[in-house]
């Protein structure tokens, strides 16, 4: 099995090395194609106005001046064009990718692009808390990741579906199990703009997030991480809302 590893934190991110080790526990044919620089929050963006630059870092390891989506396309359509990967692992992200994070995440986008290209794809993210944010450990992801992935591959990932896996901020032996979850939703009032001034008195701004309340919906990815469980969420690339499509068809046909 040939595995492609990518991420959004960049070619030098510790989480990328952790993901490569997870892949190495599953196969001896592992390739890494990741962004040259940190691409966190770029979502599923594609570089159309700037050329892509490809740099060979080491054997079977490349850096791309571009987004995670660019990296997957570069890998599948150029680097590995004669023998495409059988599996794409995107991560391990520094921080959780749950709820609305999924829409912004370059890590999840790497898996989305792989799914669009017809390759089974899994996004992997490691949550951290106030005590671990400065130096997050990927040991929980490394310990439990291979078994989770083997189980997913044994079951089979349908076409058009990607898997979003989040590991809790727990040591490997403290993980409370695995939960198959739905994508959660945060209180959007927690998002705010933090205004500041630079040394010359000019305004600048940060997008900031207040700490959310402890109330989460049972069965959601948010609740799973709160309970110290690994969250496994199947996501669809196809975003059509079929019930609404049916309703609108009836509305417009009746005009």
Curated annotation (Swiss-Prot):
Annotated keywords: Cytoplasm, Hydrolase, Metal-binding, Nucleotide-binding
InterPro entries referenced in this protein's UniProt entry, alphabetically: SurE (IPR030048), SurE-like_Pase/nucleotidase (IPR002828), SurE-like_sf (IPR036523)
Gene Ontology terms: cellular component: cytoplasm
Keyword Metal-binding: yes
Top-level division of the source organism's lineage: Bacteria
Primary location group: cytoplasm
Catalytic reactions on record: a ribonucleoside 5'-phosphate + H2O = a ribonucleoside + phosphate
Subcellular location: Cytoplasm
Function: Nucleotidase that shows phosphatase activity on nucleoside 5'-monophosphates.
NCBIfam families referenced in this protein's UniProt entry, alphabetically: PRK00346.1-4, surE
UniProt family annotation: Belongs to the SurE nucleotidase family.
Protein name per Swiss-Prot or TrEMBL: 5'-nucleotidase SurE
Organism of this sequence: Azorhizobium caulinodans (strain ATCC 43989 / DSM 5975 / JCM 20966 / LMG 6465 / NBRC 14845 / NCIMB 13405 / ORS 571)
Lineage: Bacteria, Pseudomonadati, Pseudomonadota, Alphaproteobacteria, Hyphomicrobiales
């Amino acid at each position: 099995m040939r595995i492609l590893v990518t991420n959004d934190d960049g070619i030098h991110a510790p989480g990328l090395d952790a993901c490569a080790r997870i892949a190495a526990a599953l196969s001896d044919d592992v390739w890494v194609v990741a962004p040259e620089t940190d691409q966190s929050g770029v979502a599923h963006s594609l570089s159309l106005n700037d050329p892509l630059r490809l740099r060979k870092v080491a054997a079977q390891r490349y850096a791309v001046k571009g987004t995670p989506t660019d990296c997957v396309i570069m890998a599948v359509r150029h680097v590995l064009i004669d023998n495409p990967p059988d599996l794409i692992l995107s991560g391990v992200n520094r921080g959780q990718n749950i709820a609305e994070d999924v829409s912004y995440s370059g890590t999840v986008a790497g898996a989305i692009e792989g799914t669009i290209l017809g390759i089974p794809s899994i996004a992997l993210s490691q949550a951290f808390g106030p005590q671990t944010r400065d130096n997050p450990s990927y040991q929980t992801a490394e310990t439990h990741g291979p078994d989770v992935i083997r189980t997913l591959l044994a079951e089979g990932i349908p076409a058009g579906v990607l898997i979003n896996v989040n590991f809790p901020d727990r040591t490997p032996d403290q993980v409370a199990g695995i939960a198959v979850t739905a994508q959660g939703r945060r209180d959007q009032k927690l998002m705010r703009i933090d205004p500041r001034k630079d040394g010359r008195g000019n305004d600048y701004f940060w997008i900031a997030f207040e700490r959310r309340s402890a109330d989460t919906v049972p069965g959601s990815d948010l609740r799973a991480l709160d309970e110290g469980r690994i969250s496994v969420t199947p996501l669809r690339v196809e975003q059509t809302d079929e019930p609404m499509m049916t309703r609108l068809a009836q509305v417009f046909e009746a005009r």
